[in-house]
């Protein structure tokens, strides 16, 4: 797929590499040696706005990183996204969201939902393996702050055979927080649990990469006979599906993504849903773009 100008964008989701700086050193990170590399600057606010105002259709603008909360212009970027009638969301490790005032700021600036990484669930020993640190308390506090302040969390968990056991306690904890703050899960507060396999690009654990059907089976064992939907945003997928399941606080949503790499060492290539605003402020398919950068091929 060719590089395209912003006005020709076809992707319903566009990621923005808000910053290449990070305050963690996760075992799984597709950025490889791009991480904390001064060669790669933060997004330029003016150039970002120039791209955003030229997009032809309403688009999900996904602020990613390394860690997007380390960019001091994040709230301004969110406000620009809203100004042009697009939908801002964010993928974060959640450490700064342990501060309730920061979550309130995200909500006030117009953030629609956040993807919160919780690879260890409630278990510090699992975080030590996946994220090289004990982060359970901070991430649980971040999750609670989101639910308390009506900022919808999508909880992201990379799974391999060593951490499947954290999923059920994590689901139970999410439900208990919704009970505590009287949040009915469903269309008006669409909490989603997103499970993903290990993508062997950049930095990654040398472990089994689950297929999508293995992960569907895992989720069925946890929450019942789910019905996977492989059509997302009107696009037929093979490596991604959504589902839902009943809880005592309403219908919770789920998503499963198989990050198996192809013969070129890339996951989810030629995606018709996921694009990225590149470092030269054009549009490309997400992983196809990163696959061309040497630093993603040389993990630390």
What are the roles of these predicted feature ranges?
Residues 5-45:
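Canonical Radical SAM [4Fe-4S] cluster-binding loop centered on the CxxxCxxC motif
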Residues 18, 65-66:
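Short acidic donor-binding/metal-coordinating loop in glycosyltransferase active sites
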């Amino acid at each position: 797929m060719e590089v395209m100008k912003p006005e020709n964008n076809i992707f319903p989701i566009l990621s923005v590499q808000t910053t290449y700086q990070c305050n963690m050193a996760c075992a799984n990170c597709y950025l490889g040696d791009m991480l904390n590399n001064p060669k790669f600057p933060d997004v330029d606010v003016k150039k970002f706005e120039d791209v955003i105002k030229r997009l032809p259709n309403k688009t999900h603008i996904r602020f990613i990183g390394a860690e997007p909360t380390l960019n001091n212009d994040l709230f301004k970027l969110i406000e620009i996204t809203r100004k042009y009638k697009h939908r801002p969301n964010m993928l974060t490790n959640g450490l700064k969201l342990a501060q309730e005032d920061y979550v309130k700021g995200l909500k006030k600036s117009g953030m629609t939902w956040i993807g919160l990484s919780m690879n260890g669930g409630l278990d510090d020993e699992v975080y030590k393996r996946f994220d090289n640190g004990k982060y359970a308390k901070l991430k649980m506090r971040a999750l609670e702050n989101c639910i308390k302040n009506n900022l919808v969390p999508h909880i992201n968990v990379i799974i391999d055979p060593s951490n499947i056991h954290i999923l059920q306690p994590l689901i139970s904890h999410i439900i208990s927080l919704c009970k505590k703050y009287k949040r009915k899960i469903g269309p008006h507060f669409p909490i989603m649990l997103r499970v993903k396999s290990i993508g062997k690009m950049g930095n990654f654990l040398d472990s089994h990469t689950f297929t999508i059907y293995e992960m569907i089976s895992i989720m069925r064992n946890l929450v019942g006979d789910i019905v996977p939907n492989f059509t997302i945003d009107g696009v037929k997928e093979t490596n991604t599906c959504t589902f839902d399941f009943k809880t005592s606080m309403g219908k919770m949503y789920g998503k499963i993504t198989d990050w198996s790499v192809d013969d070129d060492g890339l996951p989810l290539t030629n995606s018709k849903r996921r694009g990225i605003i590149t470092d030269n402020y054009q549009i490309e398919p997400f992983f196809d773009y990163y696959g061309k950068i040497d630093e993603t091929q040389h993990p630390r």
